Regions:
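Short, highly selective alpha-helical patches that border small-molecule cofactor pockets
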Residues: 1-2, 73, 77, 162
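Mg2+/Mn2+-dependent nuclease catalytic core
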Residues: 20-117
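Short, charged/polar micro-motifs that form catalytic or ligand-binding hotspots
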Residues: 62-70, 148-151, 179-183
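Motif I (Walker A/P-loop) of helicase-class P-loop NTPases
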Residues: 185-189
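Acidic-basic catalytic patches of nuclease active cores, encompassing PD-(D/E)XK
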Residues: 1-22
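Hydrophobic helix-cap positions at the C-terminus of alpha-helices
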Residues: 4-5, 80-83, 168
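Conserved pre-motif I regulatory segment
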Residues: 134-180
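Polybasic (Lys/Arg-rich)
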Residues: 113-146
Length: 189
């Protein structure tokens, strides 16, 4: 699909990595991914092309076939528009129907402001979950900081095991520990 697009659009860039930081309420989101393609249309408007392969019947593939595909491409377009200070962009979904070897394309035009608003709407849906995750991490970290080691000193063999675990974490590799019950293996690790 991308090779054919390169023939059609000389400036077609495939697999373009994009990363953008978006703030929603008090949460900062880093959104990233690879746009399947980005090119300039004949009218000078930049297009983000998101390619999907499907075995669904071609008759079922409509512009509203999969809203999540639009969402993905819109996020890429919002990032690209912001990074390149573009006032408008087009988002194109390209579906390749494998059984019929049929290509279907759908396009939508957006201003940079509309793209930003679309991303904010997505983040509004995701924010409650993200907020709970942030709160849980804060509580976990606070509990871990307050946690006391259960014994006043290392038990026999415990310090050596903790040192070996540290070395494996630092250098990579695997470690197999065999020690009697009650030595404090879990706490050492």
């Amino acid at each position: 699909m991308q090779r054919a697009a390169v023939k059609e659009h000389a400036d077609y860039a495939a697999e373009v990595f994009l990363r953008g930081i978006f703030a929603y309420e008090e949460i900062e989101f880093t959104l990233e991914g690879r746009a399947d393609g980005i090119f300039t249309a004949a009218d000078g408007v930049t297009v983000v092309d998101e390619i999907k392969t499907t075995a669904c019947p071609a008759a079922d593939i409509t512009p509203d076939f999969a809203p999540e595909h639009w969402a993905q491409a819109i996020v890429y377009a919002a990032i690209y528009a912001a990074q390149h200070e573009l006032e408008e962009m087009r988002v194109q979904l390209t579906y390749f129907q494998v059984d019929e070897e049929l290509i279907l394309r759908f396009e939508r035009h957006y201003t940079a402001q509309q793209l930003q608003e679309e991303v904010e709407a997505l983040l509004a849906e995701y924010a409650p979950w993200a907020r709970r995750a942030v709160e849980w991490k804060k509580a976990r970290n606070s509990d871990l900081q307050a946690m006391q080691f259960p014994f006043p000193a290392y038990r026999p063999g415990q310090r050596a095991m903790a040192g070996e675990v540290y070395k494996v974490c630092r250098d990579g590799g695997r470690l197999l520990c065999q020690a009697p019950t009650g030595i404090g293996k879990s706490m050492s690790v």
